[in-house]
Amino acid sequence: MKKEQVLNCQFGQWYPTFKKFSIRSVIIPLPENVKDYLLDDGTLVVSGREESPGCSQRDLNCTEEDEVQWSDDESTATLTAPEFPEFSIKVQEAINSLGGSVFPKLNWSSPRDAYWIALNSSLKCTTLSDIFLLFKSSDFVTHDFTQPFIYCADDSPDPNIKYELVLRKWCELIPGAEFRCFVRENKLIGISQRDYTQYYDHISKQKEEIRKSIQYFFQEHIQYNFPDEDFVFDIYKDSQGKIWLIDFNPFGEVTDSLLFTWEELRRNLCDVPGDVENEDQDCPTFRYTNREVTVQPSPYLSYRLPKDFVDLSTGEDAHKLIDFLKLNRNRQDEDSDD
């Protein structure tokens, strides 16, 4: 895998070409001070409130959200949330233009590993505060910032990256309708159920139709239109049978191979013994979770306990412990005022 392949999978690189097959999205350049804030290490504390203008139908998940502030300064008496007025306006305008709720991501990754920290246990965001909370809690987002080329073989200097905030119109996607597709030398060689921890009866019953429809979509719209010969793309097949392009990913270890192994994929799956799902060598191998497989825990469960909390419990970071105690004291003061 080369650095150029990673760069080609940035959302802003492929979306203009394939936008008519994808979910409506807005791309906003990420200011350097916002990037610095997102990378600033510390303990999450509550310091203010923010309203989301433009949410015409507000539900329990679209309410006033707490802004966030991180601090490592034990002498800080009053904690105030950072302000990015111009950026905040652009983000809120984009959220409103997309219907009031969005799914956020960076150039490559979304904060899927941080969904648990949101009040609604969802990646659905209605304010910039929602986005900050997810991004600052996500190892995936941190990886985009700090190690985007970690698995690349070429030793050339890392190219300069212009980071972007991607806001995608919020859609209620059914996990059992998401699939990951693996392309080698511009040939679709493998398709995997995205949510491999669950068994979905409709996938087993419709496997041939699913495989053929994905292959047709690839041949008509993706093949030879992406700048690399080897890549991975994710799709969603809706209830009407329409296929939506969700994302592109590099062909390599940085991308989860799901029900395949990278060793198999690099062999083009042609000589994989006993692969009953690849009887026709002209068709991609389609793997899905069968009924006999025990339901597995979510792969994101391991991200549910932030290192900051571990540091607090073990006393390894005294400054964070002081911030945590200050937060509790402030909450008690607020309760007594009420």
Curated annotation (Swiss-Prot):
Pfam families: D123 (PF07065). Coiled coil: none annotated. The keyword Nucleotide-binding applies. One of its GO terms (biological process) is eukaryotic translation initiation factor 2 complex assembly. InterPro entries: CDC123 (IPR009772). Keywords: ATP-binding, Chaperone, Cytoplasm, Magnesium, Metal-binding, Nucleotide-binding. ATP binds at residues 105, 108, 110, 112, 168-171, 178, 180, 194, 234, 247, 249. One of its GO terms (cellular component) is cytoplasm. Mg(2+) binds at residues 247, 249. It is found in: Cytoplasm. It comes from the Eukaryota. GO terms for molecular function: ATP binding; magnesium ion binding; protein folding chaperone. ATP-dependent protein-folding chaperone for the eIF2 complex. Binds to the gamma subunit of the eIF2 complex which allows the subunit to assemble with the alpha and beta subunits. Belongs to the CDC123 family. This is Translation initiation factor eIF2 assembly protein. The gene is cdc123.
